[in-house]
């Protein structure tokens, strides 16, 4: 799968209007994803502020149509570089940025770059000379894991110009969870009412045969067929980033992230409509099985408590649990405990969703260690 094919796919995706988004089967899931990104950026900004920076210089790599531009404005960013392989997406991002000049306050400076970050040196195209305080890559890094060279080039572009103490955040499909799901499906497939995951080479699903690079799968969401994607095992991502003096601050599966951020972010979650009210007459899911957990919660409430809860349908929840959220920081030159600077975010590993998923992760750790002993790159 070439970068040109990825670009063509995203260039041809129809820009959905507000009404289309409201009528989508995954309306609440998309809003939840957006809320998770907001909480992630908010926590990252705390770390950036602790590094002595109030108005960060930001790289939004694989930025798509610029869906996070408003978030960068809220952070008080000084300058944002938006880079993506799809030229139409960059054009739409730039148009979105231009509308922000109508805001009653000054907004950040920006540069929009069309670049294949898996092949080109992004630094050659960046106009500003300042290093980045914050880098963000949302739902896109895994495309670079088509092969080792592409992944290494992408990660170098992502963090190569990050200042000491700078932060790299992102969201990523959980490769171990996906492998578990398709292994336990039929003929390499997992499907529910909102998503379908297909692993191309079923014979590779036997233990230990899924490659570290080039493991192709297809993820269709809400009847929209996506272009082929590639598994990016988080343990491998961590290993490659450590070569760039990056250290892991945190990694959570989305279910864990929602639990961690629910209390501090509840008001924003409600305003962003990240949860569906149950019960109501127009539920997005059409079967009772989609809301068994919500119904059980309602039944457990006392008689004097309002009988409404916020929820996601079962299918949306299963899809959202296929993702991870992460944060890294570029090591400083001084020897000190960097984690002590960020009490708000604990360094954790994802809670295993089941024993098989955990075993898959452990197996991949072993394979990465073997690769390190016999490196293909000097």
UniProtKB/Swiss-Prot annotation:
Keywords: Methyltransferase, mRNA capping, mRNA processing, Nucleus, RNA-binding, S-adenosyl-L-methionine, Transferase
Stretches the record annotates as Disordered: 335-378
Main EC class the enzyme belongs to: transferase
Domain mRNA cap 0 methyltransferase: 24-331
InterPro entries: mRNA_G-N7_MeTrfase_dom (IPR004971), mRNA_G-N7_MeTrfase_euk (IPR016899), RG7MT1 (IPR039753), SAM-dependent_MTases_sf (IPR029063)
Signal peptide start-end: none
Similarity-based family: Belongs to the class I-like SAM-binding methyltransferase superfamily. mRNA cap 0 methyltransferase family.
Name of the protein in its database record: mRNA cap guanine-N(7) methyltransferase
């Amino acid at each position: 799968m070439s970068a040109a094919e990825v670009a063509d796919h995203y260039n041809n995706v129809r820009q959905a209007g507000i009404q289309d988004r409201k009528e989508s089967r995954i309306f609440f899931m998309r809003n939840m994803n957006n809320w998770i990104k907001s909480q992630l950026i908010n926590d990252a900004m705390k770390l950036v502020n602790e590094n002595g920076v109030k108005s960060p210089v930001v790289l939004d790599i694989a930025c798509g149509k610029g869906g996070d531009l408003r978030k960068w404005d809220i952070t008080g960013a000084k300058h944002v570089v938006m880079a993506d392989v799809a030229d139409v997406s960059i054009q739409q991002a730039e148009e979105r940025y231009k509308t922000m000049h109508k805001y009653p306050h000054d907004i950040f400076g920006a540069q929009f770059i069309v670049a294949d970050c898996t092949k080109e040196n992004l630094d050659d195209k960046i106009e500003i000379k300042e290093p980045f305080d914050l880098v963000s890559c949302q739902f896109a890094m895994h495309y670079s894991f088509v092969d080792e060279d592409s992944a290494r080039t992408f990660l170098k572009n992502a963090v190569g110009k990050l200042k000491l103490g700078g932060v790299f955040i992102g969201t990523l499909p959980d490769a171990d969870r996906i492998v578990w799901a398709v292994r336990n499906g039929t003929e390499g497939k997992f499907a529910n009412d909102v998503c379908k995951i297909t692993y191309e080479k079923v014979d590779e699903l036997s233990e230990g045969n899924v490659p570290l690079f080039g493991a192709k799968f297809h993820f269709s969401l809400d009847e929209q067929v996506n272009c082929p994607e590639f598994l990016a095992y988080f343990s491998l991502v961590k290993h490659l980033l450590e070569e760039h003096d990056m250290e892991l601050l945190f990694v959570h599966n989305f279910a864990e992230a929602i639990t961690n951020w629910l209390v501090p972010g509840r008001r924003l979650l409600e305003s962003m409509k990240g949860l569906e009210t149950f019960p109501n007459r127009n539920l997005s899911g059409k079967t009772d099985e989609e809301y068994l957990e919500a119904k059980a919660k309602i039944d457990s409430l006392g008689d004097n408590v309002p009988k409404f809860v916020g929820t996601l349908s079962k299918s949306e929840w299963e899809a959202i649990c296929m993702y991870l959220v992460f944060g890294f920081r570029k090591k400083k030159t001084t020897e000190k405990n960097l984690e002590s600077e960020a009490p708000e975010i604990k360094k954790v590993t994802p809670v295993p969703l089941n024993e098989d998923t955990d075993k898959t992760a452990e197996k991949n750790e072993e394979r990465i260690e073997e690769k390190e002993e016999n490196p293909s790159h000097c």
